[in-house]
Amino acid sequence: PMPMIAVQLLWLNLVANGFQDVALAFEPKEGGELSVKPRSPHEPVFDKHIIEHVLVVGSWMGLVAFLNFQWTLDQGQSIEEARNLTLMLMVLFGNIHALNSRSESRSLFKISLFRNPFLMLAVPLAQLAHIGAMYTPGLSDVLQIQPISVAEWLQLLALAMSLLAVE
């Protein structure tokens, strides 16, 4: 079975990318830009380092999400519940990835969270949009999602935080 249905993928693109992508455009400069050697005009925009990073991070998120989906099914949960948890995990991954994508060279832990107030508003807003959808009749039915337990929240948060070790 597929880990997510089409409408869930569309929703994921909205809540895991929509708010955060716009907010990242307001990320202040890091400083020291003038001391960095200019990139050659013949160098591709997506160099080896960026391609490698995208492959590693994307593979990690996909692998963890799929293994959690399969584990949920193996525990006797329904396909709908497994998809519900997979979607929440991917929303959490998107928020953590947005926070950690603020710099190419510095970790999330070395940059003040409040340097970009737009992102600090966008991340909780995206998460609240998804949580709100879980509790909204009609929308929760279309997305085939439902509220999750505290234990499930903790499990998904731990899995999503593993992304910080990979990035």
Where are these regions (language model features)?
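C-terminal transmembrane helices and immediately adjacent loops/tails
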Residues: 1-167
